[in-house]
Design a protein with these regions (language model features):
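Active-site neighborhoods and metal-handling regions in enzymes and metal-associated proteins
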Residues: 1-351
C-alpha cells in the first residue's frame, strides 16, 4: 500500500497535500475496509482518520499511515491537517462537505479540485489485483457451468439469479459484484433487466449477467443462453453479436484509443442495420468497483494502457422481441488481451 501512496504523490504535481474521502480510494491506498474514514497524502505525511468504532480494525489493516482517531467531526479534523495547495476529490465531496472543509482549513491553504487522481492509478492493475479478479472470474464461470446441470426451463428468473449468487458465495466469493441480470425472452431486450418471478420458457434466449467479488475485486461476465430452439432470427442475431465481440477483443490492446475499440464492434452492428439497438458503450473498467475507468464508448476519451481491466460487451436489443449480449472481462496487454472469463461463447443450450 505504501508504494501506491508514493505513486500518488508522484502524480500530484504542484499539489502539496491531497484529501481522499472516497472509501474505495481509501481502501486502495490503505487497505481499510470500514465505512468511515479519510486520509491525507503529502510528500511528508500519510495520515489516516477514522472514528472510535474502527480504531482496532484500522490498527490491523492500515500500515504506512499515521492512524488518527477523530473526534465528533472527522472531516473537520482532517481539514485542519491540510497544507499549501491542497487537492480534494470533487467527484466525491458534496457541496456541504466542501463548505465544511473550506471553513476548517488553516489560513493560507488553497483548495483545488483534484478528482480522478487515485482512480487513474487504480485503472492500471497490479499482479495481485489481477489474480483476485481472475479468481472472481473463475467463480462466475463455474456458476454458469452449474446451469448445465440445474437447467433454466421452469425456474423463475429470480430463482436463477438467487441460485447463481448462492453458488458463487458457497464457492468462496465475498459476494456478488452487482445484482445479477437474468432476463428471458422479450425481457432480454432490457440491458439491465431486473429478474422477475416469471418462469423461463422453452425455446427462448436468456441473457445472464453475473459477477463475483474476491478480496474486494470484481468480475463481470454476460452470456446469452438458449433453452431449446431459439425463435426466428435469434440465431442470426447471436452470430452478429458474437462476431462483433470477436473482432473487438483483439482491438483492446495497449495504446488503442478507447473510442476506436468501441467503433470496431459498433461498425459491425451498425452495418447489419441495428445501430439503434446497440445503445450502450462497448465496455468499462473493472476493479474494486464493477464500473470504473477506463470506458469504451463512442465518446470515450483516452487510450488503453497495459494493465487495464476492461469488459468487452456488445449487445443488440430488439424491444418486445429478444436481446443478446456477450461480455468478457479482459486484461489489456501489448498484444492480445488476456481473457479472464472462460465460459464458452458459442450458443449454449440449457434445458
Amino acid at each position: 500500500m505504501t508504494a501506491r501512496a508514493d505513486r500518488l504523490v508522484d502524480a500530484m504535481g504542484e499539489l502539496e497535500s491531497l484529501l481522499i474521502t472516497n472509501l474505495t480510494n481509501i481502501r486502495y491506498l490503505t487497505g481499510f475496509t470500514g465505512t468511515n474514514g479519510a486520509c491525507i497524502v503529502s510528500r511528508d505525511e500519510r495520515l489516516f482518520f477514522t472514528d472510535f468504532r474502527y480504531v482496532e480494525q484500522a490498527r490491523e489493516q492500515v500500515a504506512g499511515f499515521e492512524r488518527i482517531q477523530a473526534g465528533r467531526d472527522m472531516l473537520a479534523d482532517a481539514a485542519k491537517r491540510l497544507r499549501g495547495r491542497a487537492g480534494f476529490d470533487d467527484h466525491d465531496l458534496s457541496v456541504a462537505a466542501h463548505r465544511k472543509v473550506a471553513e476548517q482549513v488553516p489560513d493560507g491553504v488553497e483548495l483545488v479540485p483534484a478528482g480522478g487522481l487515485v482512480e487513474r492509478l487504480r485503472a492500471v492493475k497490479e499482479e495481485g489485483e489481477v489474480a483476485a479478479m481472475a479468481t472472481a472470474a473463475e467463480l462466475s464461470t463455474a456458476a454458469y457451468e452449474s446451469l448445465r446441470e440445474r437447467g433454466l426451463t421452469g425456474r423463475t428468473e429470480r430463482e436463477v439469479a438467487v441460485g447463481l449468487v448462492r453458488f458463487m458465495e458457497d464457492a468462496g466469493a465475498d459476494g456478488a459484484s452487482f445484482p445479477p441480470v437474468v432476463a428471458s425472452g422479450a425481457h432480454g431486450a432490457l440491458p439491465h433487466a431486473v429478474p422477475r418471478n416469471v418462469e423461463i420458457l422453452r425455446d427462448t434466449l436468456v441473457v445472464i449477467d453475473i459477477g463475483a467479488i474476491v478480496d474486494g475485486y470484481c468480475s463481470d461476465c454476460t452470456r446469452t443462453l438458449a433453452t431449446g430452439s431459439p425463435p426466428d432470427g435469434a440465431l442470426e442475431l447471436y452470430a452478429l453479436v458474437r462476431r462483433a465481440q470477436q473482432e473487438a477483443l483483439p482491438a483492446a490492446t495497449a495504446g488503442a484509443e478507447c473510442r476506436a475499440v468501441d467503433r470496431v464492434a459498433r461498425d459491425i452492428i451498425d452495418a447489419a442495420g441495428h445501430e439503434e439497438h446497440f445503445g450502450h458503450g462497448l465496455g468499462h473498467g473493472v476493479g474494486l468497483q464493477v464500473h470504473e475507468g477506463p470506458r469504451l464508448g463512442k465518446t470515450a476519451e483516452g487510450a488503453l494502457e497495459a494493465g487495464n481491466a476492461v469488459t468487452v460487451e456488445p449487445g443488440v436489443y430488439l424491444p418486445g422481441n429478444v436481446g443478446v449480449r456477450i461480455e468478457d472481462l479482459v486484461i489489456v496487454t501489448g498484444g492480445e488481451p488476456r481473457i479472464l472469463t472462460g465460459f464458452p461463447k458459442e450458443l449454449v443450450t440449457v434445458g
